[in-house]
């Protein structure tokens, strides 16, 4: 998953102008797609309480920072942002006005009370498993409490979250995220997710189908199923049998209006036969798979507790490409894990050459407090990490540009997602996730049109519409 920083657009605003005394919320989202989804669901719960969204903290009554804890310096980024908000809160107080500040997400879960100690201006700390309690927590804040909600909830948070209004969902576009699984039981030694998101939990088929049908009814054409280990999803199917993600995808493909399906992020150990069959048989399932491996060295994979070997990963890729020859792969890589030798790194480079990725994320290892990796000796020098990362990224970039160039001359169906920057221009999404720019002023957002790729841009494709 990427670690972009986004904010929730003011999609919950009513069609009519809000009253002058309406409370406004600004939500800033750091991190992965699951945080984007979580921010939207928090916004939905606040909309039910009368809040409307704003695209700036300057006129917000409530500012929520939905945080990520995967990368190094996540906490420093948070406290820097809180420092800026403290000045804003002090200025409001001088004018007799209030600003409520909340911290949500994985840093909130990891640090809890420590956030209140370091940033006394914060009013609310709420973890990712308890944001269904957000309205109640805010009521307690208005009563004068400083609130920390980071206990893992016994109740199912999704059962307690209000469904977004149809007009609000429409404003979010024709592509949507849908969380189907949370948490992780793999305990990779470098990763904080099991400690911030908890153990693996799968949403019920009934919940997922109902939410997907609501999204489709609101005009959504493409669904991306989300989970920390999304292909670990399982549950009782409508036929009474135990379903895996493959069976779930077959069920969602039957929903009228849903034209494209995707899922992320996957673990190699959970790619089962039914899921591979879905890639073979479902035309709605896009030929793009994010399948992190982290290293090409068996020795490092063992130290990371990945519980598979490099050749097992390569054989899995071969199986998938045998049933879906046009499959494009993306991945995640960590360089400089404790004990990584030159040969270990060269093994990673060779695996990258063998797979030939369409796109991948790569990072220097940074120890995360509380993880087993943080206690390992034989740390790699920063200069060595830097040199290895540069080499790996150069190879991955070359593969990415080669993949984009291979699209030139190809014909494909593209889902139109939004107007482009130029008049009459539209931006769509290729089956392989790349943005596609088309000079077209007749079709509408949500239409699927047939195009030919004529050139490439920076991380995008340029296309002509075909009759």
UniProtKB/Swiss-Prot annotation:
Q: How is the cofactor bound?
A: Binds 2 [4Fe-4S] clusters. One cluster is coordinated with 3 cysteines and an exchangeable S-adenosyl-L-methionine.
Q: Which residues form the Radical SAM core domain?
A: 170-402
Q: Describe the location of the TRAM domain by residue ranges.
A: 405-467
What EC number is given for this enzyme? 2.8.4.3
GO CC terms in record: cytosol
Q: What broad class describes the main subcellular location of this protein?
A: cytoplasm
| Region (Disordered) residue spans | 1-20
User: Where do the annotations place [4Fe-4S] cluster 2 binding?
Assistant: 184, 188, 191
- Catalytic activity reported: N(6)-dimethylallyladenosine(37) in tRNA + (sulfur carrier)-SH + AH2 + 2 S-adenosyl-L-methionine = 2-methylsulfanyl-N(6)-dimethylallyladenosine(37) in tRNA + (sulfur carrier)-H + 5'-deoxyadenosine + L-methionine + A + S-adenosyl-L-homocysteine + 2 H(+)
Molecular function terms from GO: 4 iron, 4 sulfur cluster binding; metal ion binding; N6-isopentenyladenosine methylthiotransferase activity
Is the keyword Signal in the record? no
Q: Which UniProt keywords apply?
A: 4Fe-4S, Cytoplasm, Iron, Iron-sulfur, Metal-binding, S-adenosyl-L-methionine, Transferase, tRNA processing
* Residue intervals of the MTTase N-terminal domain: 23-143
Instruction: Kindly give the Pfam families that the UniProt entry links to this protein.
Output: Radical_SAM (PF04055), TRAM (PF01938), UPF0004 (PF00919)
Top-level taxon of the source organism: Bacteria
Disulphide linkage map = none
Q: What does it do?
A: Catalyzes the methylthiolation of N6-(dimethylallyl)adenosine (i(6)A), leading to the formation of 2-methylthio-N6-(dimethylallyl)adenosine (ms(2)i(6)A) at position 37 in tRNAs that read codons beginning with uridine.
Tell me its family: Belongs to the methylthiotransferase family. MiaB subfamily.
NCBIfam families registered for this protein in UniProt? miaB-methiolase (TIGR01574), MiaB/RimO family radical SAM methylthiotransferase (TIGR00089)
Q: What protein name applies here?
A: tRNA-2-methylthio-N(6)-dimethylallyladenosine synthase
Q: Which organism is it from?
A: Brucella melitensis biotype 1 (strain ATCC 23456 / CCUG 17765 / NCTC 10094 / 16M)
Corresponding gene? miaB
């Amino acid at each position: 998953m990427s670690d972009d920083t986004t904010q929730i657009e003011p999609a919950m605003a009513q069609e009519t102008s809000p009253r002058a005394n309406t409370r406004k919320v600004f939500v800033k989202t750091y991190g992965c797609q699951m945080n984007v989804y979580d921010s939207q669901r928090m916004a939905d719960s606040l909309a039910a309480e009368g809040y409307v969204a704003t695209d700036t903290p300057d006129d917000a009554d409530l500012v929520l920072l939905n945080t990520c804890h995967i990368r190094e310096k996540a906490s420093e980024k948070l406290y820097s942002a809180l420092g800026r908000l403290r000045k804003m809160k002090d200025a409001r107080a001088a004018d007799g006005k209030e600003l409520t500040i909340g911290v949500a997400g994985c840093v909130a879960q990891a640090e809890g009370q420590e956030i209140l100690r370091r940033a006394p201006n914060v009013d609310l700390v709420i973890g990712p498993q308890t944001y269904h309690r957000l309205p109640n927590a805010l009521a307690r804040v208005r009563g004068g409490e400083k609130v920390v909600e980071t206990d893992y909830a016994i109740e199912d948070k999704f059962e307690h979250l209000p469904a977004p209004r149809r007009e609000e969902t429409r404003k979010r576009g024709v592509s949507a995220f849908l969380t189907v699984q949370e948490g992780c039981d793999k305990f990779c030694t470098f990763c904080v997710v099991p400690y911030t998101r908890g153990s693996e939990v799968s949403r019920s088929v009934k919940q997922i189908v109902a939410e997907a049908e609501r999204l489709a009814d609101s005009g959504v054409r493409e669904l991306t199923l989300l989970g920390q280990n999304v292909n670990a999803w399982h549950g009782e199917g409508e036929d009474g049998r135990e379903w895996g993600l493959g069976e779930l995808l077959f069920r969602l493909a039957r929903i009228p209006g849903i034209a494209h399906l995707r899922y992320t992020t996957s673990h190699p150990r959970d790619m089962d036969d039914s899921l591979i069959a879905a890639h073979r048989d479902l035309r709605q399932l896009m030929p793009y798979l994010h399948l992190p491996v982290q290293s090409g060295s068996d020795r490092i994979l063992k130290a990371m507790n990945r519980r598979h070997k490099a050749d097992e990963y390569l054989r899995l890729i071969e199986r998938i490409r045998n049933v879906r020859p046009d499959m494009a792969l993306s991945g995640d890589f960590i360089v400089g894990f404790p004990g990584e030798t030159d040969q270990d790194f060269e093994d990673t480079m060779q695996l990258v050459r063998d797979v030939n990725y369409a796109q991948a994320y790569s990072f220097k290892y940074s120890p995360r407090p509380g993880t087993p990796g943080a206690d390992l000796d034989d740390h790699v020098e920063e200069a060595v990490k830097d040199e290895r990362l540069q080499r790996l990224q150069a190879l991955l970039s070359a593969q990415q540009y080669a993949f984009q160039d291979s699209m030139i001359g190809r014909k494909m169906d593209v889902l139109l997602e939004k107007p482009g920057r130029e008049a009459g221009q539209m931006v769509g999404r290729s089956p392989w996730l790349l943005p596609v720019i088309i000079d077209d002023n007749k079709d509408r957002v949500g239409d699927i049109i047939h195009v030919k790729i004529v050139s490439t841009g920076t991380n995008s494709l340029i296309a002509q519409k075909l009759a």
